[in-house]
Amino acid sequence: MNQKLLLTLVAALALVAGVGMGGWFSTQSAENETPQYLQTFPEPRQLAEVTLLNQHGETVTNELFKGHWSLLFLGYTFCPDVCPTTMAALGKIYPELKNISTDSPIQVVFVSVEPKRDTPERLASYVEYFNPEFVALTGEHKMLFPFARSMGLMYAIAESTDNPNYLVDHSASVVVVDPNGLAIGRFKPEYN
């Protein structure tokens, strides 16, 4: 299946799901009344090389993204709003995404940018709630920050970590990574 067709199907399924990715992840074009669900990058972006831990405590690298279509979302398990909403939206459309006929399977990858509190055990519990097939990753900030930037995403600890309930500001986009391990676009939230 070609890239354009797959992305169109992902967007259509998101719209049908009636959650985020149809309206919440959509933007309207000024010249066209048809919603544009995916902002494609002018050129595919090479992901920064990383070594991270998955929810099983296993070390993973960028090889995780090779041979798969990946929907990648940055967040953290203590996030009070956008993370559970986005993960629920991904969980809702994932069964339909898996049914898309493609040579490269689709995976959802949650990358925690808060390794202090998000242990592999906590990540396992978190992603399993939304779908046990989802992958969760975390690692040191020296790996996470360049990785996020390579996709055009950002995050920052918003307040003192002395407060046990501190927040982390982070991008709310879901990045699409192709089977070659290149970021090709993102679903951006709409801020109305």
Language-model segments: residues:
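Thiol-based oxidoreductase modules, predominantly thioredoxin-like and allied folds used
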Residues: 103-118, 133-142
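Short, internal strand/loop/helix patches
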Residues: 124-171
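Conserved helix-turn-beta segment immediately C-terminal to the redox Cys motif
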Residues: 68, 87-110, 128
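Short extracytoplasmic
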Residues: 36-72
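Extracytoplasmic/secreted envelope proteins and their assembly/folding machinery
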Residues: 84-94, 120, 124, 141, ...
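Thiol-/selenol-based redox modules, centered on thioredoxin-like
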Residues: 161-192
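Short active-site neighborhood of thiol/selenol oxidoreductases, capturing the structured segment around
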Residues: 60-86, 90
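N-terminal targeting signals for export/organelle localization
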Residues: 1-49
